[in-house]
Each structure stands twice: as structure tokens, then as C-alpha cells.
């Protein structure tokens, strides 16, 4: 048979072989027992401790414990790396803080030298990260900034025990310029200057100014607070800045920072904040960061009273005429005048200046607030939009009624009075002759046209393009303030509404569809007879159609498509192209001055006679007044 596995017949040392047992007999039976020996030792089995060999079992346990320790060490290393990544992501480096602190305090010049752009702006985070509880245990940064009356302390300490400290005794030996530089290093230099200003002057700087966000906004009046000025420079400021200003109000106080100046300046021309910063930095020898520059409050009575009262005291140096906005709010007479707003005065102003548009009235009247007490009261009102709308509405009513009361002769005379200069009527005559128009026939047609003679109420200027038809007609409409209608709006029911308020009207560049519309709907309008117009927000209005001037490239007076218009239009043909000189200017001046001269010269030929019955003042239509008159009280003996 085969030998059993693992058995070696030659030697008995295998696991299945024979064992050699050697017994050592230390004491035989019957030997006497010594007194020093303990009889119970044999019973404890101490001599059998190493009887069983457990070396292999201990080796296996050691290997298991080593593997567990290695796994634990690897897990601990992994966790440390994860925590370190989070610290690098959310916590600042202590070494960088230390280097920044050391550089800022030891070498400010080294701090100014930088090759790369450093963006120190704070990032906006959606959620605020909670404190992890892990601080900079190896290196600690402590920055203490204390701003008090005379002491300024900045401390930067590290965990190793090194520190850089500035004592109060050293601060007293430094110049005021150094003190103000240290103050400006605070996190909010503007707040520090505002606090120091209120401490010195007893009033907040923001109560005296109205802030301008843009540095490019211009203004003539500016309020300036400057800090850290040398005493000699502060005393000479009034003399240095006088050539640039119309009004100077300067207050000067001293503190631990140096001299502090509060100035109200009115410059000779409007300036922006950037220009003033450059000027004052040059005159006061300080940086722009140590100045507060804003325009003053112009409509604040407490602010005006502050400037008014301090100007009379001995703490201020004043030169020049007091600004009107201070006088208006401090002098008793101006206060009474600003109390009540009168709408009729505003309407009278708009009527006299021919303002009928809401925007023009609001803008122009607001500009009068500095000189007109009623305009100032208008700006103080909370219903400016309603006032402007009511003013424009009333002005249009007065203008419309006045125009209806005037005859054509009176209207032309009124328009001539609006033109100041006298022109040359010959330019218009030369232009008509250049276009081969009989001047006598034109005067006869113009006379019937202005008087609205039936069948002669419409003049057609016909000709090729670029012959000056529109220029001739538009210049006449501009002088007589006529209305313009356009066929492009013919789909609307109200496209003829401008005829409602017009003394004369014009339709430019009539085409075939336009002539077809006129032939179908406006024959009686060309006759000069009463027509019915659809006007917005009103019932149908009946009125006599004003004289109508039409320009066209189609001769409707001879076109067979519209035979009923042949007797209703008076046609003048322009044959030649409008001439210009080498500079591109018109050879013939068709403007208001020449039209004024033309009507003055042909006044009798056009049968434009004035009314014989005039008022007592010698004028058929005296100046319109919508304000109540002031009664004059006489003194009696």
C-alpha cells in the first residue's frame, strides 16, 4: 500500500511519527523534604506552564492586530486629508495673514509694490457658512484698532510672541498728517470723517448736503469738509480760493487730526466733484480721500438758517453776496411771497410766452423758481402734474378764443409783430419770377385766398420734383402759424381735426388717391363753405374751412379724372429746379423776415385793412390779462 501522506518512515520527527520523551527525575519517592521547600508547589502546576507550545496562535493574533492598526491608520489619514481640503477651501491661510500684517506694518512701501492685480473684493455667498470650531491653532492674528480722542493703537501679534505695537506716546510726537492717514486706514474712512465732523461742529454733515452719486454732475454751489490741513494753509484758504468763487463761507476748527475746514463755496461757473477735488487738493496740499464734497441743500430751511446764523458769528469768514436760496428761506419778505401759489399767474406767463405744451410749461416754469416766488411755490406743491395740465388747458382755450375773434388782417399783423427783424420782400418776388409765375396774378389769387372767397379758397402749387414747392408753402405756413394735414392719416376720423383751430392750412404732396378723396368728400371744403368735422371728445363741429394750400406733382386743375375740381383750385406752376449757391445755401431766402416785409409791402394790394373801431388804448385787441388787478389805495387828507 502507499505510504500515508506526510509520513517519513526513516525519521520519527513528523507530525505522525514517534516522539522521544526524556524524563528528568529531580526527586525520588521517600527522599526527605527540605524545610525551605513548599510542599504545595507541585500542586499549583507552575512547572507545567510551558508544557503546551502556543507560539503559532500568538503569531496569528499579532498579524490580525497589525492589519487592524494599519487599516485604522489609513482611515485616519484619509479623514485628515478630507478635513484639510475643507480648511483650505473655507479658511484663510494663517501664514498669508501673518505676512500681510507684517508687510503692512513694517514696510508700507513694499505693500504698494505689486506685479499682479489683487482682487480683494468680497464674494457674495448665498448662505453664511457656520463656524467649524477649528481656529488657526498654529498661528493667531490679532488686529486691534482703537480710535479715541488722542490715542490710536494698531497691534499685530503672532503666536510665537513677536508683536509690533504703536504706543500713544509715539503718536503724540507724529504730525497731524500721519494721524489722518492712520484714520483713513480704518475699514470705513468716510464714517470716521463724518463722526469727527459731528463731534467738532455739533451738526451732521448729511443735514447740510444733498448727495450726488455721480462725480460728473455739475453744480455752482458746493459744501466742502476737509481734514488734516496744516494751520498755515487753512488760514490762507480764503485768499487762495477767492479768484475762483463768487461767495465764500469758511469755518475752521482744530483737533487731533489737524485743522478741519467747513466751506460753502459758490463758483463762478458750474463744476463737478472731480474738478473741485483737484483744485482743493492743490490748494490745501491734502489728498482727495480726506475731503467730503457734496452740493448743499437748497430747499432746506434748517440748513439755510445754519449758514445764515454762522455767517453772522465770529467763527466764520464770509466774502461775497449771500446766495439767493439762503435769502429766500431766511428773509421774512421772501417767506411771505412763497406761501401761496396762484394758478392765474402761471397761466398768464404761459400765455405771454406762447407755451401750450405740457412739457414745455413744466420745464420752463420750473427754471424760474430761483427768481419767481410763484414758481417756487409751484415746485413745493404735491400736485405739479395736475397744475401743469390745467395751465396748458386754460392757455389753449384762451389762444383758441383769441384766434377766432381775429380777422385775417389782424392775425397777419399779429404774426408780423412777432418777427423782430425786417427782411427783403424782393427775394420772394424774384423766386416767383424765377419759376415763371406772374406776380400780379399771384397777388390777385393770394388776396382772394386770404379772404376765403368761394371757389378761390384753395391754391395748388404744381410742378416737377425739386422745384421748391414744399419749401415755399412751408415757409408761408411757419410765418402765419398755419396747420398741416397729411393724407397718411386719412383712415382716421380725426385727420382733419387740425383745421378746427387754424387760420390757414396746408396739404403737402397730394397724390392720386388724395385727389380722389378730395373730389369725393371735400368739394365743399375747397369752396370755402361750412363743413362738419369730427373732433376728439366732442360732438361734430361745424366751421368754415380755412384757406387751404396744396402742393402736388399732379395738376388736378386740368386732369380729366377730377373734372369737378377744375373750378375749385387755382393752379400755379413751378417750372425750374430750386437753385442753391456753391455752399449749399438757398439763393432765395424764404423766411419769416422776408414774409413780414412782403406782407408789409403788399398790405394794401391784398386789401388787408385794419378795423376802424379801435379801443380807447388805440389797439383793436389789447393785451390779454387773466390775473386780477391790484387796487391802488390813495391817501386822503
From Swiss-Prot:
Gene Ontology terms describing biological process: DNA replication
PROSITE patterns attached to this UniProt entry: SF3_HELICASE_1
Coiled-coil region(s): none
Enzyme class: isomerase
Annotated SF3 helicase domain residues: 437-587
Motif (Nuclear localization signal): 87-89
PTM note: Phosphorylated.
Record's catalysed reaction(s): Couples ATP hydrolysis with the unwinding of duplex DNA by translocating in the 3'-5' direction; ATP + H2O = ADP + phosphate + H(+)
Nucleotide-binding recorded as keyword: yes
Motif position, Nuclear export signal: 106-115
Keyword Magnesium attached: no
Record-listed Phosphoserine modification sites: 93, 97, 107
Enzyme Commission code: 5.6.2.4
Region: DNA-binding region, residue numbers: 172-338
Subcellular localization(s) per the UniProt record: Host nucleus
GO MF, one annotated term: ATP hydrolysis activity
GO CC term (a single one): host cell nucleus
Cited SUPFAM superfamilies: Origin of replication-binding domain, RBD-like, P-loop containing nucleoside triphosphate hydrolases
Function: ATP-dependent DNA 3'-5' helicase required for initiation of viral DNA replication. It forms a complex with the viral E2 protein. The E1-E2 complex binds to the replication origin which contains binding sites for both proteins. During the initial step, a dimer of E1 interacts with a dimer of protein E2 leading to a complex that binds the viral origin of replication with high specificity. Then, a second dimer of E1 displaces the E2 dimer in an ATP-dependent manner to form the E1 tetramer.
Name of the protein in its database record: Replication protein E1
Organism field: Human papillomavirus 35
This protein's encoding gene: E1
Amino acid at each position: 500500500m502507499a505510504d500515508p501522506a506526510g509520513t517519513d518512515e526513516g525519521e520519527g520527527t513528523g507530525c505522525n511519527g514517534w516522539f522521544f520523551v526524556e524524563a528528568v527525575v529531580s526527586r525520588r519517592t521517600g527522599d526527605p523534604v527540605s524545610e525551605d521547600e513548599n510542599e504545595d508547589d507541585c500542586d499549583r502546576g507552575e512547572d507545567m506552564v510551558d508544557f503546551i507550545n502556543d507560539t503559532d496562535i500568538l503569531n496569528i493574533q499579532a498579524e490580525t492586530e497589525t492589519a487592524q492598526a494599519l487599516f485604522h491608520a489609513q482611515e485616519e489619514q484619509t479623514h485628515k486629508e478630507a478635513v484639510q481640503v475643507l480648511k483650505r477651501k473655507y479658511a484663510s491661510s494663517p501664514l498669508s495673514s501673518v505676512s500681510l500684517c507684517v508687510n503692512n506694518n513694517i514696510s508700507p512701501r513694499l505693500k504698494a509694490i505689486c506685479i499682479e492685480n489683487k482682487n480683494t473684493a468680497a464674494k457674495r455667498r448665498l448662505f453664511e457658512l457656520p463656524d467649524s470650531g477649528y481656529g488657526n491653532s498654529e498661528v493667531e492674528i490679532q488686529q486691534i484698532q482703537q480710535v479715541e480722542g488722542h490715542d490710536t493703537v494698531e497691534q499685530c501679534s503672532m503666536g510665537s510672541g513677536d508683536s509690533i505695537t504703536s504706543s500713544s506716546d509715539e503718536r503724540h510726537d507724529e504730525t497731524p498728517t500721519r494721524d489722518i492717514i492712520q484714520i483713513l486706514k480704518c475699514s470705513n474712512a468716510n464714517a470716521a470723517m463724518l463722526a469727527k465732523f459731528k463731534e467738532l461742529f455739533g451738526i451732521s454733515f448729511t443735514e447740510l448736503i444733498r448727495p450726488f452719486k455721480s462725480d460728473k454732475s455739475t453744480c455752482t454751489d458746493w459744501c466742502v469738509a476737509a481734514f488734516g490741513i496744516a494751520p498755515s494753509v487753512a488760514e490762507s484758504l480764503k485768499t487762495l480760493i477767492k479768484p475762483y468763487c463768487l461767495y465764500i463761507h469758511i469755518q475752521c476748527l482744530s483737533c487731533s487730526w489737524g485743522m478741519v475746514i467747513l466751506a460753502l463755496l459758490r463758483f463762478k461757473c458750474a463744476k463737478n466733484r472731480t474738478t473741485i477735488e483737484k483744485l482743493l487738493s492743490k490748494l490745501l496740499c491734502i489728498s482727495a480721500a480726506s475731503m467730503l464734497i457734496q452740493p448743499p441743500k437748497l430747499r432746506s430751511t434748517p440748513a439755510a438758517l445754519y449758514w445764515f446764523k454762522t455767517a453772522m458769528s465770529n467763527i466764520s469768514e464770509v466774502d461775497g453776496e449771500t446766495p439767493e436760496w439762503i435769502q429766500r428761506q431766511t428773509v421774512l419778505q421772501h417767506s411771505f411771497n412763497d406761501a401761496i401759489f396762484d394758478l392765474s399767474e402761471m397761466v398768464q406767463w404761459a400765455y405771454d410766452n406762447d407755451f401750450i405744451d405740457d412739457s414745455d410749461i413744466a420745464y420752463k416754469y420750473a427754471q424760474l423758481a430761483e427768481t419767481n416766488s410763484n414758481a417756487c411755490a409751484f415746485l413745493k406743491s404735491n400736485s405739479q402734474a395736475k397744475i401743469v395740465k390745467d395751465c396748458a388747458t386754460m392757455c389753449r382755450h384762451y389762444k383758441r378764443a383769441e384766434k377766432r375773434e381775429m380777422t385775417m388782417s389782424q392775425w397777419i399783423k399779429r404774426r408780423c409783430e412777432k418777427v423782430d427783424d425786417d427782411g427783403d420782400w424782393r427775394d420772394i418776388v424774384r423766386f416767383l419770377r424765377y419759376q415763371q409765375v406772374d406776380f400780379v396774378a399771384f397777388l390777385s389769387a393770394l388776396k382772394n385766398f386770404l379772404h376765403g372767397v368761394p371757389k378761390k379758397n384753395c391754391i395748388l402749387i404744381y410742378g416737377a420734383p425739386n422745384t421748391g414747392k414744399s419749401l415755399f408753402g412751408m415757409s408761408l405756413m411757419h410765418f402765419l402759424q398755419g396747420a398741416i394735414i397729411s393724407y397718411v392719416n386719412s383712415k382716421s376720423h380725426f385727420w382733419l381735426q387740425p383745421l378746427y383751430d387754424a387760420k390757414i392750412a396746408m396739404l403737402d404732396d397730394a397724390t392720386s388717391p388724395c385727389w380722389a378723396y378730395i373730389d369725393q368728400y371735400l368739394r365743399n371744403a375747397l369752396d370755402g363753405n361750412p363743413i362738419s368735422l369730427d373732433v376728439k371728445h366732442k360732438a361734430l363741429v361745424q366751421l368754415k374751412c380755412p384757406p387751404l394750400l396744396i402742393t402736388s406733382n399732379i395738376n388736378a386743375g386740368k386732369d380729366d379724372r377730377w373734372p369737378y375740381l377744375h373750378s375749385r383750385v387755382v393752379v400755379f406752376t413751378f417750372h425750374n429746379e430750386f437753385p442753391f449757391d456753391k455752399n449749399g445755401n438757398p439763393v432765395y431766402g424764404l423766411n419769416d423776415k422776408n414774409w413780414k416785409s412782403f406782407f408789409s409791402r403788399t398790405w394794401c394790394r391784398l386789401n388787408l385793412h385794419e378795423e376802424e373801431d379801435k379801443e380807447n388804448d388805440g389797439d383793436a385787441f389789447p393785451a390779454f390779462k387773466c390775473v386780477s388787478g391790484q387796487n391802488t389805495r390813495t391817501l386822503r387828507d
